[in-house]
C-alpha cells in the first residue's frame, strides 16, 4: 500500500514541481502586465497581422518606398523616401568642405 520512494520518482516529483512553479510565475507576470497595459491604454487595438504581407500593421495597403518623395529642407530637392538618409548625409556634408 505504501508507494516506494526511488531516486527517479523523487527527482521526477521535484522536476515537475519546479516546472509548474516556473510556468505559474510566467503566467502571473504576463497577466499583471496585460492588466496594467489595459488600464493605461483602454482604447488600444491590437495590430493587424497579414500573412500575405500586402498590408501594413494598421490593415492598410502598403505604399511602395519609391512612391514617397520628401523635400529636402537644405537644398529643396525632391528625394525618394528610401534614399533620403543618404541624400541628407551628402547634402549636409557639402557645406563642411
Curated annotation (Swiss-Prot):
First and last residues of each zinc finger (SGF11-type): 70-91
Coiled-coil intervals: none
Species: Kluyveromyces lactis (strain ATCC 8585 / CBS 2359 / DSM 70799 / NBRC 1267 / NRRL Y-1140 / WM37) (Yeast)
Family the UniProt entry places it in: Belongs to the SGF11 family.
Subcellular location: Nucleus
Disulfide bond residue pairs: none
The protein's assembly and partners: Component of the 1.8 MDa SAGA transcription coactivator-HAT complex. SAGA is built of 5 distinct domains with specialized functions. Within the SAGA complex, SUS1, SGF11, SGF73 and UBP8 form an additional subcomplex of SAGA called the DUB module (deubiquitination module). Interacts directly with SGF73, SUS1 and UBP8.
Name of the molecule in the record: SAGA-associated factor 11
InterPro entries xref list: SAGA_su_Sgf11, Sgf11_N
Role, per record: Functions as a component of the transcription regulatory histone acetylation (HAT) complex SAGA. At the promoters, SAGA is required for recruitment of the basal transcription machinery. It influences RNA polymerase II transcriptional activity through different activities such as TBP interaction and promoter selectivity, interaction with transcription activators, and chromatin modification through histone acetylation and deubiquitination. SAGA acetylates nucleosomal histone H3 to some extent (to form H3K9ac, H3K14ac, H3K18ac and H3K23ac).
Gene that encodes the chain: SGF11
Keyword tags: Activator, Chromatin regulator, Metal-binding, Nucleus, Transcription, Transcription regulation, Zinc, Zinc-finger
Residue spans crossing the bilayer: none
Gene Ontology molecular function terms on file: transcription coactivator activity; zinc ion binding
GO CC annotations on file: DUBm complex; SAGA complex
Domain notes: The long N-terminal helix forms part of the 'assembly lobe' of the SAGA deubiquitination module.
GO biological process, one term: chromatin organization
